Amino acid sequence: SVVLLYSAHSLPMSVVNRGDPYPAEVAATVWAVQQRLGHKNPYRLCWQSQVGPSAWLGAQTSDTVKNLVKKGQKDLVLIPISFTSDHIETLFEIDQEVIHEANELGADGRVKRAESLNGSTVFIQGLADIAKAHLDSGEPCSRQMGLRCPGCTSERCLESKKFFLGQKERTNDAVTL
């Protein structure tokens, strides 16, 4: 059976260890997609685009593909879950590097990448619906935006959160003028 590999952009562990919600948010997205698909295929969430010598969130997409192919699992579909359009991390990193390495290990062209959303009319309509619902709510941002990562010490992060949360007062002031 085909194994689905959801590939998302990785984060340095220093960011993850401060409590950044991104890994949980990506995992929740993967779970929602799997629910929609009826859990018909086995799957894994893996991470790509690590740079530099520091520790990053793993397992790496390239390592996951190599290890599965070496174990005989050659039918893989890579799903760039955190990439909504084609760019260097899909067209080069996945298509050229990861899939090429898999074929060198004997995958025989059976490792594929799901098409990115790009200009899909369904995707664009979905974004428009989300934007409209947000605008109709009158809220400047989601409540989640105001919650700092538990270990965050970045003043820039704090100031951006204060800015977005302060937009409600500015919006209310503008409405009452």
Where are the model-predicted features located?
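Active-site-proximal alpha-helix that buttresses catalytic centers in soluble enzyme cores
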Residues: 1-177
